[in-house]
Amino acid sequence: MKNAIAADWAAPTKVVAFSTLRDGGVSKAPYESLNFAYHVGDSATNVHKNRTTLSAHLSPKLQWQWLQQIHGAGVVEVVEPTVELAADALFTKQPNVVCCVQTADCLPVFFAARNGSEVAIAHAGWKGLVAGVLENTVRKMSSDASEIIAWL
């Protein structure tokens, strides 16, 4: 995808991870183009268009799970995507599920089992880091910690 940074890690080829940049969307200032967040005051129509633009760059078979980040340490398993969940990390064992977090001044941390059986993503702000969001994410995954890789 144009305007994205692809993860450079040793994950299996079926695991895709990337972080988008701000260009390529329709949101106006102060959201500046590719805003995916409904909660910041941007037009819901623009956010929906931006999310649709993102999903159009990937396979239509994919199901998207977005988070409403709360700057904590909560981790949610995605069995079937639903409305935005309130937590700071997601993990799934389901194929074709895209786990999404939104970041500005926080860091997205991607996780994958070396065998590709499960993936996770965490929204790592300072409050979540202090509360243990990364540790909780690894604990929630069923793979042994030694079999989980991460990309920052």
Language-model features and meaning:
Residues 1-19, 23-24, 29, 86:
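Conserved nucleotide-ligand handling architecture
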Residues 13, 43-51, 130, 134:
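Generic structural signal for well-ordered, non-membrane alpha-helical segments
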Residues 14-17, 33, 64, 98:
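A residue-level signal for beta-strand positions that form part of recognition/binding surfaces
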Residues 16, 96-98, 105-106, 114-120, ...:
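Surface-exposed, charge/polar-rich loops and edge strands
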Residues 28, 74-76, 128-131:
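Short acidic/glycine-rich loop or secondary-structure boundary segments that cap or lie
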Residues 29-34, 77-79:
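Short, glycine/acidic-enriched capping/hinge loops at junctions between secondary-structure elements
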Residues 44-124:
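Phosphate-centric recognition/catalysis
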